[in-house]
From Swiss-Prot:
GO terms for molecular function: DNA-binding transcription factor activity; transcription cis-regulatory region binding. Its main location: cytoplasm. It comes from Acidobacterium capsulatum (strain ATCC 51196 / DSM 11244 / BCRC 80197 / JCM 7670 / NBRC 15755 / NCIMB 13165 / 161). This is Transcriptional regulator MraZ. Belongs to the MraZ family.
Length: 146
């Protein structure tokens, strides 16, 4: 399980060096293949291939004519790309996603349980300020026992 956050950088070639804590977990559990994508173009989502295959298994249960499935697949395939981690623990973020999510230079990598999320540090801070946790959010989470 991935948790916490680690500030890092995306180099001029678009490579993200995976933070040591996350890389250790990846080495122990997953291997070097990933599917990198986004549902909104605002953040990059890095799925170990085994975790992405779980998403695909769930998608396979949804009829192909379902409009939500089509929208989801359109987006994740538009931004998505299979990548392999190199010997230095780096993954190449797809150019279209780097540009859309502005994930160049200083970024932050969040553990999102089964995948990693990469965000532009400044844009993420602004989004948190514009969208604070509300009483409604807390109530919705309380319904799940959180």
């Amino acid at each position: 399980m991935f948790r916490g956050n680690h500030p890092t950088r995306v180099d001029e070639k678009g490579r993200l060096k995976l933070p040591a804590d996350f890389k250790r977990r990846i080495d122990e559990q997953y291997g070097s293949q990933f599917f990198i994508t986004s549902k909104d173009g605002k953040v990059a989502e890095i799925y170990p291939l085994q975790e992405w295959e779980k998403v695909e298994q769930k998608l396979a249960q949804i009829p192909n004519m379902n409009p939500a499935k089509k929208k989801f697949l359109d987006r994740v395939n538009y931004y998505g790309q299979m990548v392999e981690m190199d010997a230095q623990g780096r993954v190449l973020l797809p150019q279209i996603l780097r540009e859309s999510a502005q994930v160049t230079g200083d970024v932050v990598v969040f553990g999102m349980q089964s995948y990693l999320e990469v965000a532009n540090h400044e844009a993420f801070k602004q989004n948190m300020e514009l969208n604070p946790m509300t009483a409604e959010d807390e109530q919705a989470l309380a319904e799940f026992g959180l």
